[in-house]
Amino acid sequence: MFVNLVLVAAMFRRVSGVVHTQELQPRFREIIVERGSFGGSEKVALITMRGLISSNLPGTVGDSMVDDLRSALQQARDDNRVKAVVLEIDSPGGEVTASDEIYNAVVKTRKRKPVVIYMDTLAASGGYYVSCGGKFLMANETTITGSIGVIIQTLNYEKLFDKVGLASVVFKSGKFKDMLNGARPMTPEERDYMQGFVMKIYDKFLGIVAKERNLPADNLRNTIADGRILSGKEALEHRLIDGVGELEDAFAKAKQLGGAPSATVVKYGPPFSLSRFFRAFGEAGDSKIKLELPKQFVPQLESGHVYLLPSFYAP
């Protein structure tokens, strides 16, 4: 009996160690999307980026969706059998810093192996920012893209406060410390400061587009880089992308650029974990009825935060 208990304890420690290691170094499982030649080991990795780009949205294996994408791109970089990557994007954009982090991860991957960007229904603003990191950009003719611009918004509720008899009391260390306070109007000096701040971020966005697409920044500034959205067909005409087609065409292009015409296309999905497995059973037993939109469809914008988003997405 004592020997059995010792064996069980040893097995438990071994399993716990494996699970702990997987949690420290999350790896994505591979789901075959398009099978290549029999016996071949070469692969094209399909990675998806969907919904609002935000470090506040939880990931499936990491702390956030940004962590997930960076981990997936790293896995593709480190796998010698992966000859190219297809990054499928369906996103309106999102936080500036989160978009920049993913863009840099795409560029880092591109330096090791070809990255083909496929823009699905929507790849606008921050979604296009991320796309610029790819070697070859492809979209559907009806894809909504472009929206090269930056937005910060806040609410002014001064009149509402007056109506209900509320007043905002602020103690501040400097004149700009509460410049987005909605309980009072902005001063001209505050407005100029915020506009200048927005334009600095816009110039960085514009510079990335100009560099990656080999287009004159001034020409972009005076034409299409004014926040307007473009169809995939229009984006091709303005050289914001390299081609139009379907997802299968992106696979073919990735195989061509990676020199692996017979490669198998694999999609990265979340790995199996005991915690997710048991959580699924717990949720199945929850009898509460919930009417909720998926988080990626609910605007998660916070007042005063800087976003790369089309104007129609901002509430």
Where are these regions (language model features)?
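N-terminal organellar transit peptides
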Residues: 1-117, 121-124, 136-140, 152-315
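Active-site loop architecture of trypsin-fold serine endopeptidases
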Residues: 142-150
